[in-house]
Amino acid sequence: MLTDLEKNAIRDHYQNIGKNLPGFRPRASQREMIAAIANAFSRTLTREEGEEAPKREGESIAVIEGPTGVGKSLAYLLAGGIMAQTRGKRLIVSSATVALQEQLVDRDLPFLVEKSGLELTFALAKGRGRYLCPYKLYQLTQNNAQQNVLGLEAPEVLWDSKPKPEELNLLRDIADEFSARRFNGDRDAWPEKIDDAIWLKVTNDRHGCLKSACPNRAECPFYLARDVLETVDVVVANHDLLLADISMGGGVILPAPENSFYCIDEAHHLPKKALSRFAAEHSWNIAVWTLEKLPQLTGKIAALTDKAELANLADEAATSLLDSLHEWQFHLAEEPSLSLGSSENDRRKHNEPTWLWEDGKIPEGLETTVSNTAIAARSLLKHVIGLNDALSAARREKEQDGALLDRLTSEFGLFIARIEQISAVWDLLSTVPIEGEEPLAKWITRHADDKNDYIFNASPISSASHLANSLWRRAAGAVLTSATLQSLGSFNLILRQTGLLWLPETTTLALESPFNFDTQGELYIPPVHASPKDPDAHTAAIVEWLPKLVSPVEAIGTLVLFSSRKQMQDVALRLPDEYLPLLLVQGELPKAVLLQRHHQAIAEGKASIIFGLDSFAEGLDLPGTACVQVIIAKLPFAMPDNPIEKTQNRWIEQRGGNPFIEITVPEASIKLIQAVGRLIRTEQDYGRVTILDNRVKTQRYGQQLLACLPPFKRIG
């Protein structure tokens, strides 16, 4: 229950914004969101001393759909910040995109502090991989870096291939700038793009980290940043970092869930982000390289730690795993679904050959092979972790070999990370779910451009149970928000995907839009007779209709959204000549350049037409005359073309369900709402949405999809 102190603090600081910002208008929807968040967080269950952790069923969790214009970030920062301070928690704000993270840290939080008078401290959290490791950097850039503790040339271990002069020069430049404190060690702060292969050599990773024993601990960018996170009220992160922390048990990178209130913005991205986090994959080639090189490392570790027996066990496990992987070569070579096309053209036409294990079941006759591979990987991981612990102990005890042990620990970290990845894959591949449980998706792909390499993959088909048990049931409180969370007028899809459907006390709230859609916009569905199921005829129809809908001389912006890159390109090529100079096609220019040219054309009194795909249907902000018309070529149905979706669809069908109705249509509803949402961005905007897909009229689900769109005036 909210205390009077909390109520007064929220009211007073919100009123301060109006006093300090001329023209600020309190919005009813924003106030409603503030109240909903504060009330949810006030219901947090606390753990009394000597008692077990409280059983949380969603009483302090709210799912809030806040349309564009509500002012969501101000609402959750104000309510969440105050509630975190009064309840002794930390506020963790997580977003899906870098753009929103930067907006929160650079604009929204400073604005709130300045205008409301609320004293909030905040910091941006990033994963280890965004920071360099000074120890690795200095080792690679010292004059003797071509020789290392293993007695091997650096290219053999520190580099996968001989470093180029420009690569070494770049690392020396980075080292010079870092040591002079002109570069803070954050990859995003380096003025030029650093190639992934180069950054991997100097990045901070948990296995290679020397922690408190590191001679460069005092200048380590990662630890300096983490120290700051321990002192602030608000931590701004992204979904990937949040999920990484949860997968490690929580409280490793970010504050512990039990001590945190979460604001999950752009929450509709969370389920698929979580799936990626809980999945695993490894390359056959990289695994073999790792296992072949490993004995050179274990021998050196044994000599420095007196752990010869443990090193021998690791070598035996590595040999066993290597034998298993070589055995897999025979099985993979005989699998028809992994055969490559007979010509280079065939390879380019098709995706990489994939062997999907139907229903996640291990193929007949391979049960023992899968089990043996998993056992060998698990055993190897156990032994290399033991060797790593021995290295850490030796580093604390031995002074004379300190530098050698440091170098070896850092290099060994790469191998542990890869072995951990291999073991995770085979743990999933060997898992047999209990009868009635969701299957795991399991598949193997073959590189079309490298016929000798295969990728082993495994993934849950849903992240719901992981999120429910690892996050929601542990968190002190959470709010999930986005402009689009409902599908077909219901929160069921997002609740099911996130696992919140299992927490019955979770509250949901759909806020009213501040826009007058019936006067600001129109919805037009022209009589397009060609069905999208006939791609050629439908493309011809779009080419016919666009000149009727878009003037080549009126100085307004038009956004045309396609579901197919091929159709987008075909239409662009077949439009009348006078339209070609007006076109800005996604993929032909960097996004920032494309948008800059679009705004410039409008400012110069010219028409401008953007052709875009699904990614332009979300997050693109084109207010005013920059977007007066949105044309949707086809309903955004996603085809179940990846192994996870195929496995999920089969499981639904086996349970008597219909994946098209249960998944495809609801997800299309969300995408369609997002696409339509590109039109009206402010209370002054106006325009028209046109849908060139006759299925909204001819199919029953079409009316369901239309019913969920803003109440524009219908024409035609």
Task: Mark where each language-model region is.
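A substrate-engagement module of RecA-like helicase motors
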Residues: 2-18, 25, 49-57, 87-90, ...
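Conserved helicase motor "Helicase C" RecA-like lobe of SF1/SF2 P-loop NTPases
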Residues: 563-587
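A contiguous, basic/glycine-rich beta-loop/short-helix subdomain that forms a polymer-engagement track
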Residues: 199-235, 243-253, 387-529, 538-539, ...
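Conserved RecA-like P-loop NTPase helicase motor core
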Residues: 526-537, 588-697
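Walker A/P-loop
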Residues: 47-78
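Conserved interdomain hinge at the start of the Helicase C-terminal
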Residues: 469, 526-563
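Signature of the SF2 helicase/ATPase Hel1-core->accessory helical subdomain module
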Residues: 76, 82, 99-102, 107-110, ...
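Walker A/P-loop NTP-binding motif
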Residues: 38-42, 73-87, 107-111
